[in-house]
């Protein structure tokens, strides 16, 4: 098995078939809807809030609302009342089951539900998937997070409509340091490994440091890429604004950090300051254009044409050109 990550892989270009990158279609389908780009902001308190999710939905982007200090039922009611799709996160505790029961009682059904726990290959996730499929069968269920083919196979067999791959590769995640487990440092290999057995969409979660990493994720099997740090630190971001030496920053912390949990127990995340990047809309436009450029370099016109290219591994035991077989 080849071990590599985003920073030591490059994709090999093929003959360009377009006059301009604007001819390339960066859109992707997930759960019966088409979205402008294969990227989604991480469902974290310092990345998304109600207003950002509304804007994303109204402008053709996928979103997943976080599950912290939030009335999910009210959120779904308000989003659907605005004519937007509703995409929420749930855990696997009793309050999460109670939330599902409230949806049923009120005749509400979120279009997307992400079961969002740090170690998603678990009986607790199996049970929640089963409950959702029984009570809210029209919801598109994303389950995670996982990092092995066995986990992907199990989640799909349990009824998940998509799986989220990535354990601890994120910029503010310290799972690998705290536990010794995870996909940090080899997230792209883990994605490739998991995608080989997947029959349903994979969302690659974590480890993205640049827009080119989106194309690399698609090449190795991702349908959608969840990103935290690149989407944090915008003017609209919900994180607290901090000024140091005349420069403005936004706080950004992991979902399992003591800042998010409000207590120093079972901490697997940290807090950092992200320089304020400007407006989120501008970043999304740039991201879409960069993905379009990636498609043009792949010799194609559609997003999934990126999966046809060869690649090279830079340095290490696996270095060299790897042809698509």
Swiss-Prot record:
Name the InterPro entries on file. Aldolase_TIM, GMP_reductase, GuaC_type_2, IMP_DH/GMP_Rdtase_CS, IMP_DH_GMPRt
Q: Gene3D superfamilies attached here?
A: Aldolase class I
GO terms for biological process, alphabetical: purine nucleotide metabolic process
Give the enzyme's main class according to its UniProt record, as a single word.
Answer: oxidoreductase
Q: Which reaction does it catalyse?
A: IMP + NH4(+) + NADP(+) = GMP + NADPH + 2 H(+)
Q: Where does NADP(+) bind?
A: 202-225
Name the Enzyme Commission number(s) assigned to this protein. 1.7.1.7
Q: Which residues form the active site?
A: 173 (thioimidate intermediate)
Q: Which PROSITE patterns match?
A: IMP_DH_GMP_RED (PS00487)
A single MF term (Gene Ontology):
GMP reductase activity
Name the family.
Answer: Belongs to the IMPDH/GMPR family. GuaC type 2 subfamily.
In terms of Pfam families, this protein maps to: IMPDH
Keyword NADP belongs to the record: yes
The family database entries (NCBIfam families) matched by this protein are listed as: GMP_reduct_2 (TIGR01306), PRK05458.1 (NF003966)
Q: Which UniProt keywords apply?
A: NADP, Oxidoreductase
Origin species, per record, is Delftia acidovorans (strain DSM 14801 / SPH-1)
Q: What is this protein called?
A: GMP reductase
Tree of life domain: Bacteria
- Which cellular components does GO assign to this protein? cytosol; GMP reductase complex
Q: What does this protein do?
A: Catalyzes the irreversible NADPH-dependent deamination of GMP to IMP. It functions in the conversion of nucleobase, nucleoside and nucleotide derivatives of G to A nucleotides, and in maintaining the intracellular balance of A and G nucleotides.
């Amino acid at each position: 098995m080849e071990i590599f990550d985003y920073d030591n892989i490059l994709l090999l270009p093929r003959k360009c078939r377009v006059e301009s990158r604007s001819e390339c279609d960066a859109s992707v389908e997930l759960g019966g809807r088409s979205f402008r780009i294969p990227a989604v902001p991480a469902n974290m308190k310092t990345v998304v809030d109600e207003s950002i999710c509304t804007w994303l939905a109204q402008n053709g982007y996928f979103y997943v609302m976080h599950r912290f200090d939030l009335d999910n039922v009210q959120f779904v009611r308000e989003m659907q009342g605005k004519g937007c799709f509703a995409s929420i996160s749930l855990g696997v505790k009793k309050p999460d089951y109670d939330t599902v029961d409230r949806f049923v009682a009120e005749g509400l059904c979120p279009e997307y539900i992400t079961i969002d726990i740090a170690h998603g290959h678990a009986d607790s996730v199996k049970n929640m998937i089963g409950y959702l499929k029984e009570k809210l069968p029209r919801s598109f269920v994303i389950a995670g997070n996982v990092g092995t083919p066995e986990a992907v196979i199990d989640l799909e067999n349990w009824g998940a409509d998509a799986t989220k791959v990535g354990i601890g590769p994120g910029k503010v995640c310290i799972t690998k340091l705290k536990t010794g487990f995870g996909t940090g440092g080899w997230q792209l290999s883990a994605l490739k490994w998991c995608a080989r057995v997947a029959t349903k969409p994979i969302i690659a979660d974590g480890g993205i440091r640049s827009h080119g990493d989106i194309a690399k994720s698609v090449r190795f099997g991702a349908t959608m890429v969840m990103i935290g740090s690149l989407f944090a630190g915008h003017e609209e971001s919900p994180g607290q604004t901090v000024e140091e030496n005349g420069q403005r920053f936004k706080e950004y912390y992991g979902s399992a950090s003591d800042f998010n949990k409000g207590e120093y127990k079972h901490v697997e995340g940290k807090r950092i300051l992200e320089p304020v990047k400007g407006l989120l809309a501008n970043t999304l436009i740039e991201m879409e254009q960069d993905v379009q450029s990636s498609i043009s370099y792949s010799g194609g016109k559609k997003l999934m044409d990126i999966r046809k290219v060869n690649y090279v591994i830079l340095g290490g035991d696996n270095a060299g050109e790897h042809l698509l077989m």
